[in-house]
Amino acid sequence: MSEKYWNIASHYFAGGVNSPVRAAVKPYPFYVERAEGAYLYTADNKQLIDYVLGYGPLILGHANQYVTKKIIEQVNKGWLYGTPSPIEIELARKISHHLPSAQKIRFVNSGTEATMLALRLARAYTGREKIIKFHGNYHGAHDYLLLDAGSAFTEFNVNVYNGIPKSIVNTIRICEYNDAECVEKLSKSEDIAGVIVEPVMGNMGVILPDKDFLERLREITLTYNSVLIFDEVITGFRLGLGGAQGTFNVTPDLTTLGKIIGGGLPIGAVAGKKEIIDMLTPAGKVFNAGTFNANPLTMTAGLATIEVLERENVHEVANRAVNVILEELVNALDKKIPNNFVINHIGSMFQVFFGVKKVSNATEAKLANKEMYQKFHNLLLQRGVFIPPSQFETIFTSYAHKDVVVNTTLEILRKVVQEL
């Protein structure tokens, strides 16, 4: 059935899909008809253990019963009002309580919208135009931050300048991730409005910040009066209720959010200092609006998700799943291909890089053996485990990845590693 769907889809969609990474499964993507817990159920009557989880939002797993119940209750009350609703206040209160930087919040509809708005705020706040980003960091599909972005361009060899005006390109400066000295040099020599960073890179595989890297960014931006923006679309509420900023004890001026705070429904948010967020209309003169901003259905799903995170041991279960899997995987790979791989991980996020011993930035990640990763992916998929088809995405676990799921995964991993 998936092949049939693919052939039909190719008539209607560019490349047959509506987001390019979905086409990375070869020879054609499989089509999912339903999902529950840690499992996907395909149109080809296959059950797959899912370690993609919608590329990050589903920290509770698929169709969590409590979230589902709350969504259905809200559907019965209506799902779009065009007015404020009490539920948006409740979700904002939760985020503000847990996230160190979140004095005030503006909800939007995607991570892309959130980073667009964060740049607009940084420029308005400082009166400057130039933004520093990092090679391989992905901040959404808009013109200002596509340069040297992550997985999509590395995987599909896209010319990132296609359709982007040179005037926009000229406002962006790029440093290598973990290179704070580059940031300081640019901050000294140019009028920098802000620095935007994934505190943990999640769209180039998983790449962790070096010791003191985030602290140095905070020091530099304070010294030169520029705005520090953490893009926590992936890490927000995944590394813990306080996100990466809570984990690393570094508080940015602005934080962009998405994924988990919408409970699997479309969402984005910019959170940060009161004096910056209050520049937004109608309080200030920086424009933002959206028909679906803070729509009650998404607010309900996000609030329900955070309520589960607060009262149950979600992070403990998801993190334990990674630790158990990696213990087995490292041992198996050490025997099969010693000194020829590295696994980066934090919390419930990890990625395997073959053919290299260290990955601390995008340049090093690109040296990994993509063909071996693709073989690893294909072998796992054939045996019923779905990890990202791209080397430069993140493998996620969830609250649904309990012992029975993990044990099945371990059995499959042992067989797959022997076939590499």
Curated annotation (Swiss-Prot):
Residues forming coiled coils: none
Cofactor: pyridoxal 5'-phosphate
GO MF entries: glutamate-1-semialdehyde 2,1-aminomutase activity; pyridoxal phosphate binding; transaminase activity
EC number: 5.4.3.8
Gene Ontology biological-process entries: protoporphyrinogen IX biosynthetic process
Superkingdom assignment: Archaea
Gene3D superfamilies: Aspartate Aminotransferase, domain 1, Type I PLP-dependent aspartate aminotransferase-like (Major domain)
Keywords associated with the record: Cytoplasm, Isomerase, Porphyrin biosynthesis, Pyridoxal phosphate
One Pfam match: Aminotran_3
InterPro entries, per database record: 4pyrrol_synth_GluAld_NH2Trfase, Aminotrans_3, Aminotrans_3_PPA_site, PyrdxlP-dep_Trfase, PyrdxlP-dep_Trfase_major, PyrdxlP-dep_Trfase_small
Localization of this protein: Cytoplasm
Cytoplasm keyword on record: yes
Modified residues (N6-(pyridoxal phosphate)lysine): K259
Pathway: Porphyrin-containing compound metabolism; protoporphyrin-IX biosynthesis; 5-aminolevulinate from L-glutamyl-tRNA(Glu): step 2/2
Enzyme type, top EC level: isomerase
Listed GO CC annotations: cytoplasm
Catalytic activity as recorded in UniProt: (S)-4-amino-5-oxopentanoate = 5-aminolevulinate
Signal peptide: none
Family: Belongs to the class-III pyridoxal-phosphate-dependent aminotransferase family. HemL subfamily.
NCBIfam families: hemL, PRK00062.1
The protein's name: Glutamate-1-semialdehyde 2,1-aminomutase
Gene name tied to this protein: hemL
